[in-house]
Swiss-Prot record:
Name of the protein in its database record: NAD(P)H-quinone oxidoreductase subunit I, chloroplastic
Gene Ontology CC: chloroplast thylakoid membrane
Cofactor: [4Fe-4S] cluster
Cofactor binding, note field: Binds 2 [4Fe-4S] clusters per subunit.
List of residues binding [4Fe-4S] cluster 1: C64, C67, C70, C114
Origin: domain of life: Eukaryota
Organism: Populus alba (White poplar)
An individual GO BP term: photosynthesis, light reaction
Subunit structure: NDH is composed of at least 16 different subunits, 5 of which are encoded in the nucleus.
Ligand binding ([4Fe-4S] cluster 2): C74, C104, C107, C110
GO molecular function: 4 iron, 4 sulfur cluster binding; iron ion binding; NADH dehydrogenase (ubiquinone) activity; quinone binding
UniProt subcellular location: Plastid, Chloroplast thylakoid membrane
Catalytic reaction equation(s): a plastoquinone + NADH + (n+1) H(+)(in) = a plastoquinol + NAD(+) + n H(+)(out); a plastoquinone + NADPH + (n+1) H(+)(in) = a plastoquinol + NADP(+) + n H(+)(out)
UniProt topology in membrane: Peripheral membrane protein
Amino acid sequence: MFPMVTGFMNYGQQTIRAARYIGQSFMTTLSHVNRLPVTIQYPYEKLITSERFRGRIHFEFDKCIACEVCVRVCPIDLPVVDWELETNIRKKRLLNYSIDFGICIFCGNCVEYCPTNCLSMTEEYELSTYNRHELNYNQIALGRLPMSVIDDYTIRTILNSPQSLIKMGKPPLIKD
């Protein structure tokens, strides 16, 4: 054939192919028009976390036996466990437990392999600070309950229980 005719045929095929691609893209766009937006206005609306969300780690000091399994299974050897051996009872006594959330990758291995279940994952994800040293949580900060639990009226904390109020010399709160 003539070179000019084959050039027009190639141009025509490329034009048809380009129109088909544009049509497919337009159909994909139209299929998403009727969907609801998924954007969350963050400071004003909070994200509803899933059931298996891995947020900040909660630590219960009384349950920990200082076995250091959490340190061994952590990919970055992050939890710092300080303990001393009680020779008279032949057991370890936990002195200090801390996790630096600036380094933590929130893999959840420490929670999964803990034999006494003293570690658990919370739904708290707002850990931003201006100073990275504030992300180093000790056993007191790790044991603190999230604000969502503290503000829940169905949960009574130990601090507000009638027994603790009597021990502190305050009259117990009576709710009608």
